[in-house]
Swiss-Prot record:
<keyword id="KW-0547">Nucleotide-binding</keyword>
<dbReference type="GO" id="GO:0006808">
    <property type="term" value="P:regulation of nitrogen utilization"/>
</dbReference>
<dbReference type="GO" id="GO:0005524">
    <property type="term" value="F:ATP binding"/>
</dbReference>
<dbReference type="InterPro" id="IPR015867">
    <property type="entry name" value="N-reg_PII/ATP_PRibTrfase_C"/>
</dbReference>
<dbReference type="InterPro" id="IPR002187">
    <property type="entry name" value="N-reg_PII"/>
</dbReference>
<keyword id="KW-0535">Nitrogen fixation</keyword>
<protein>
    <recommendedName>
        <fullName>Nitrogen regulatory protein P-II</fullName>
    </recommendedName>
</protein>
<comment type="function">
    <text>In nitrogen-limiting conditions, when the ratio of Gln to 2-ketoglutarate decreases, P-II is uridylylated to P-II-UMP. P-II-UMP allows the deadenylation of glutamine synthetase (GS), thus activating the enzyme. Conversely, in nitrogen excess P-II is deuridylated and promotes the adenylation of GS. P-II indirectly controls the transcription of the GS gene (glnA). P-II prevents NR-II-catalyzed conversion of NR-I to NR-I-phosphate, the transcriptional activator of glnA. When P-II is uridylylated to P-II-UMP, these events are reversed.</text>
</comment>
<dbReference type="Pfam" id="PF00543">
    <property type="entry name" value="P-II"/>
</dbReference>
<keyword id="KW-0804">Transcription</keyword>
<dbReference type="InterPro" id="IPR017918">
    <property type="entry name" value="N-reg_PII_CS"/>
</dbReference>
<dbReference type="GO" id="GO:0009399">
    <property type="term" value="P:nitrogen fixation"/>
</dbReference>
<comment type="subunit">
    <text>Homotrimer.</text>
</comment>
<dbReference type="InterPro" id="IPR011322">
    <property type="entry name" value="N-reg_PII-like_a/b"/>
</dbReference>
<dbReference type="GO" id="GO:0030234">
    <property type="term" value="F:enzyme regulator activity"/>
</dbReference>
<dbReference type="GO" id="GO:0005829">
    <property type="term" value="C:cytosol"/>
</dbReference>
<keyword id="KW-0805">Transcription regulation</keyword>
Length: 112
């Protein structure tokens, strides 16, 4: 079992969700986050004053998947989130030691 976590541009959420649904991913968690990397940020003008925007709005998507689905999930996210511009995001994969479905008590792969 693995967690696939991706940081993406907010306007790409629907495309990513559709791509994951197409490969059989049944659920995901989305969190609004802010951050920066190579993109660094930008400046904006508000009421005639220039402001430096260091942290850019992004979305963090997390999905719990069986190990055999990880590569397909990563490929689906990468293909659907890509714009070809700096700031497209990152994908991270890490292991789950134990999972429990609270409602039924099912554990590990049955809980996914």
């Amino acid at each position: 079992m693995k967690i696939v976590m991706a940081i993406i541009k907010p306007f790409k959420l629907d495309e990513v969700r559709e791509a994951l649904t197409a490969i059989g991913i049944q659920g995901l968690t989305v969190t609004e986050v802010k951050g920066y990397g190579r993109q660094k940020g930008h400046t904006e003008i508000y009421r005639g004053t220039e402001y430096a925007v260091s942290f850019l709005p992004k979305l963090k998507i997390e999905i719990a998947v069986a190990s055999e689905l990880v590569d397909r999930a990563v490929e689906a996210i990468a293909a659907s989130a890509k714009t070809g511009q700096i700031g497209d995001g990152k994908i991270f994969v890490y292991s789950i030691d134990h999972a429990v479905r609270i409602r039924t008590g099912e554990t590990d792969s049955e809980a996914l």
